[in-house]
Regions:
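Positively charged, low-complexity intrinsically disordered leader regions
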Residues: 1-19
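Ribokinase/PfkB-type carbohydrate-kinase core domain
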Residues: 1-5, 66-67, 72, 95-238, ...
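Conserved phosphate-binding/catalytic region of the ribokinase-like
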Residues: 1-5, 147-148, 202-319
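Cofactor-binding loop segments of dinucleotide-utilizing enzymes, especially the Rossmann-like FAD-
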Residues: 9, 50-54, 161
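Substrate-binding N-lobe of the ribokinase-like
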Residues: 20-95, 102-109, 319
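Residues at secondary-structure transition points
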Residues: 23-30, 56, 171, 203, ...
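Short, conserved phosphate/pyrophosphate- and ester-handling motifs at nucleotide-, phospho-/glycolipid
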Residues: 39, 190, 254
Length: 319
């Protein structure tokens, strides 16, 4: 089984309680934290790296990660910074909208030296998102981590995961996201995100997929809500159906999909070293197997409110 290091923000999702929208419950979340927990709950060896506060919420988050089986030894505690929070609203279909409180919070203060302290020989997969690209210092650190992982022959997984409200200047967004492509083996985007980035470059959806591959991306996974998932590489391109479900909360569905794909991809113990794991992305059968597993994970997650509690265990996916 491959070992995952997921990097980025771990924060508090303030989820609505009842129908008034006035009462909210603090729930652990953050896209890369969800991926780390999802991977661990399926049975994988999972680490999480990022900045975390010493405040009440920070302690709660660290305990929550550890309780789900995530190794938290790569966390950097930032004593004088607060924990980021996000106010989550859900519509009738379970789709989300977000309002972030993330000014100088602990998750924004992870630096290059923190990556240097990690024993990369123990890591097979490095995962990150673009939510740590919004300000220059944390973007520089994030890109440094991706470069370091790539140099160490670690599979680099990048979920674009755009949250436009986090960006003070969205003109910087596409350039920063695209700088990461040269160090990315596996790229995950929603169809909406891909169309946004394609428009920024003045091209079509298909043009943008070709651009990503030309930058060195080995495999692109494009999700589209209840529609089919696209698996695209230089060698193949195909779509897989998504099961029809009644969605209660889609908060961590994409993260569950990523965790499931990475887990299934690296599941054969004693066989895959970092090099062959990257090469496995080029095999259509392997990709289809992992993507079908990932789709089940995402669908199950939509049927429960919250993030960590909604992420499935292996028995749920196999049943």
């Amino acid at each position: 089984m491959s070992t995952l290091l997921s990097f980025g923000e771990v924060l508090i999702d303030l989820l609505p309680v009842g129908h008034s929208g006035l009462v909210h419950e603090p729930i652990p979340g953050g896209a890369p934290a969800n991926v780390a927990v999802g991977y661990a709950k399926l049975g994988g060896k999972s680490h999480f790296a990022g900045g975390i506060s010493a405040d009440h919420y920070g302690v709660m988050l660290q305990d929550a990660l550890a309780a789900q089986g995530v190794d938290v030894s790569c966390l950097t505690v930032v004593p004088d910074a607060a924990t980021a929070t996000v106010l989550v609203s859900l519509d009738a279909q379970g789709e989300r909208s977000f309002s972030f409180n993330r000014q100088n919070t602990a998750d924004m203060l992870y630096r290059e030296a923190d990556f240097d302290a990690i024993d990369w020989s123990q890591i097979d997969i490095f995962h990150l998102c673009s939510n740590t690209f919004t300000e220059k210092a944390i973007f520089t650190a994030s890109l440094y981590g991706a470069k370091k992982a790539h140099k160490e022959q670690t599979l680099v997984s990048f979920d674009v995961n755009l949250r436009l409200s986090l960006w003070q200047d969205t003109r910087l967004l596409s350039a920063r996201v695209e700088q990461c492509f040269g160090y990315t083996h596996l790229l995950k985007m929603s169809k909406e995100e891909a169309l946004y980035l394609a428009l920024e470059r003045g091209g079509s959806f298909d043009d943008y997929l070709a651009f990503c591959i030309a930058q060195g991306v080995r495999l692109i996974l494009v999700t589209n809500g209840a529609e089919s998932v696209l698996c695209h590489s230089a060698e193949f391109s195909f779509e897989l159906p998504v099961p029809k479900i009644v969605a209660i909360d889609t908060t961590a569905a994409g993260d569950s999909f990523v965790a499931g794909f990475l887990f299934e991809l690296g599941r054969d113990e004693g066989y895959f070293t970092p090099g062959p794991l990257v090469q496995k992305l080029l095999n259509r059968v392997n990709v289809q197997t992992a993507a079908e597993f990932a789709i089940k994970c995402g669908a199950i997650t939509c049927t429960t409110k919250g993030a960590f509690p909604a992420l499935p265990v292996l028995a749920q996916v196999q049943s």
